[in-house]
Structure formats: C-alpha cells, structure tokens
C-alpha cells in the first residue's frame, strides 16, 4: 500500500515538474525561434522528469527512490540559486551619490541593430546616464560573425541617438563572454581613471554572476536590471546556474 501511494505521489509530482521544465526549455524556441544551453538542459531535465513514472514502474522501488532523491536535491539547489539570483538583482540596485561607471554587457545584434534584449539593457543604461550626467559608460561586446559592426559599436550608436554625448562612451569591442566583458572593461577603467563603483546594465538573471566577477577585480558592483523579453528569463536563469558552476567551481 505504501509503495502504491509513493508511486502515485512521485509520479504526479514528477510529471508536473517535468511539464514546467519542458515549458521553460521550449519557450525560447517556440516564441523566438532560437535556443541556448540553459533551454536545452531544462528540456532534457523535463523529459527525464516526465519519464520518471515509467522508469519507476520498471525499476525496483529502492533504485527509483534513489533516482527521485537525486532529482529532488538537484532541483532544490538549482531553484534556490535561481531564486537568490533574482532577489540579488533587485536588492543591489544602484543608489549612489557619486557618478559611477556604467558597463553595458553585450548581447545579440542583427543587421547593425540591437536585439530586443540588448535594447532593453541600453535603455536601462540610458536611465542611469541621464541621472548621473558626469558618469561614463563602457559598452562591451565583440564582433558577431556576419555582422558589419561590433556589438560595442551598435550600442554606442544607439546611446548617441538617444542623446548621450559620444565622449561619455568608451568602446570595448574584443570580448566574447561575460568574463571578458568585465576583464577588458577593467583595463579601460584603470587606463582612463574612471570610477570603480560599477553599475552593470544587463538582465536580472545576469547580475549575480557579473557582480561576482566585478568583485574579483576589486571594484564595487551595483545593478541596473533591464526587463527580459517574455518567456526568456526562466531558461536563462538555468543557463546562469550552469555558468556559475563552470566559472566559480570548475575553473576555480
């Protein structure tokens, strides 16, 4: 009897959790026609969870129970980290008396124009720059294959068109990752004697890992979190969880 009840409970919970993971993983492709590592992992995990009731029936109770415990532990850790990252981006918002240095983290561009995600980041950076007229901004992003100009140049053009003076904007156009965004921007900050109070203009899911990298270089990070397009944030939180493991555990 206990085995039957356990089977029903685990099967139902696993199916619901699996459907949620599948939705998170498939949403970027279904809505925007693309995918990424976080979405792929969420999709695979979702399939495994949905398949759990079938595996439970075919495997001995003890093995199925251990599989469930392992799945529950991984899910809890991942969910906890994702929740903490989301809270961090809102509790560490910029509130400064002195003008900071704003770093805009690059993202996809197409035909010399920013994607919706990148435009949202730039609009958030514009808000900070408008609030602090003496603040400088580093736009950070290299050249995407097939594009006529770097992400940094696209971002600079966008901000200038919105009214930000070109001499307030410094371009970092060599980076290909978040770590390089901040590493190469650090060199620009030191070379130009800019403020070491750093406001990161990026999506909320990006803020925690970016802040940890900024701290590694002795700077003080603050958040200016932009809104993520509908349906993208959950899968990107999964990607950030994986990136945190890679950056601070595997590469440590």
Q: What annotation goes with each model-predicted range?
A:
Residues 234-252:
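A transmembrane-helix-recognition feature enriched in membrane-embedded lipid enzymes
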Residues 2, 6, 59-66, 111:
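Membrane-interfacial loop-to-transmembrane-helix junctions in polytopic alpha-helical membrane proteins
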Residues 68, 80-239:
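A structural signal for short, hydrophobic/glycine-enriched beta-strand patches
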Residues 10-13, 67-74, 239:
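Hydrophobic alpha-helical transmembrane segments of polytopic
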Residues 1-9, 251-252:
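Short, Lys/Arg-enriched, disordered terminal segments
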Residues 6-55:
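Membrane-embedded alpha-helical segments of integral membrane proteins
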Residues 48-91:
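Transmembrane alpha-helices and immediately adjacent membrane-cytoplasm interface residues
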């Amino acid at each position: 009897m206990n085995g039957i009840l356990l089977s029903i409970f685990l099967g139902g919970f696993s199916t619901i959790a699996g459907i949620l993971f599948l939705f998170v993983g498939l949403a970027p492709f279904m809505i925007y026609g693309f995918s990424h590592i976080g979405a792929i992992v969420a999709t695979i995990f979702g399939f495994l969870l949905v398949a759990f009731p079938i595996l439970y029936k075919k495997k001995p109770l003890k093995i199925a129970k251990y599989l469930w415990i392992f799945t529950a532990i991984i899910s809890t850790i991942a969910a906890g980290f994702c929740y903490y990252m989301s809270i961090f981006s809102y509790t560490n918002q910029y509130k400064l008396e002195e003008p900071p240095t704003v770093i805009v983290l690059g993202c996809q561009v197409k035909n010399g124009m920013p994607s919706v995600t990148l435009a949202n980041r730039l609009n958030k950076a514009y808000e900070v720059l408008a609030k602090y007229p003496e603040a400088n901004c580093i736009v950070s992003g290299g050249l995407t294959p097939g594009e006529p100009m770097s992400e940094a140049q696209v971002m600079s053009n966008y901000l200038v068109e919105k009214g930000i003076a070109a001499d307030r904007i410094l371009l970092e156009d060599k980076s290909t990752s978040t770590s390089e965004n901040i590493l190469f921007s650090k060199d620009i900050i030191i070379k130009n004697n800019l403020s070491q109070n750093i406001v990161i203009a990026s999506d909320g899911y990006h803020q925690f890992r970016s802040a940890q990298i900024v701290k590694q270089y002795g700077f003080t990070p603050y958040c200016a979190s932009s809104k993520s397009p509908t349906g993208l944030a959950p899968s990107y939180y999964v990607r950030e969880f994986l990136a945190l493991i890679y950056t601070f555990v595997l590469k440590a």
